[in-house]
Amino acid sequence: MAPKKAPAAAEKKVKKAPTTEKKNKKKRSETFAIYIFKVLKQVHPDVGISKKAMNIMNSFINDSFERIALESSKLVRFNKRRTLSSREVQTAVKLLLPGELARHAISEGTKAVTKFSSSTN
């Protein structure tokens, strides 16, 4: 026996009225994980990193960034200027990082800014 067909009225689907509710989207959190991993592979190609260690490194970089930004903004306000320049960032790095580490950070930062400037022109 063939299955019986339902009446035509029963086949129509009931459409719901559009609602103003939005779906909860997963909020993306931006991390430095890919950059940490790239540097790790440059320095030690055969070494891996755990999620916990990656989270610690990410927190360290975020903290360092915040400290440098805060110190730079203080220097701008102290000098009664309105524009944050590379000079204030370099001075903040000198104040926050000890000796050789500060010199190395400044040279790497200068190199990165030069590379960026030449690529945008």
From Swiss-Prot:
Gene3D superfamilies: Histone, subunit A (1.10.20.10). One of its GO terms (cellular component) is nucleosome. It is found in: Nucleus; Chromosome. The modification N6-acetyllysine is found at residues 5, 41. Monoubiquitination of Lys-115 gives a specific tag for epigenetic transcriptional activation and is also prerequisite for histone H3 'Lys-4' and 'Lys-79' methylation. PROSITE patterns: HISTONE_H2B. Residues 1-27 are annotated as: Disordered. The keyword Ubl conjugation applies. SMART domains: H2B. There is a cross-link at residue 115 (Glycyl lysine isopeptide (Lys-Gly) (interchain with G-Cter in ubiquitin)). It holds the Pfam family Histone. SUPFAM superfamilies: Histone-fold. PANTHER family: HISTONE H2B. Core component of nucleosome. Nucleosomes wrap and compact DNA into chromatin, limiting DNA accessibility to the cellular machineries which require DNA as a template. Histones thereby play a central role in transcription regulation, DNA repair, DNA replication and chromosomal stability. DNA accessibility is regulated via a complex set of post-translational modifications of histones, also called histone code, and nucleosome remodeling. This is Histone H2B.
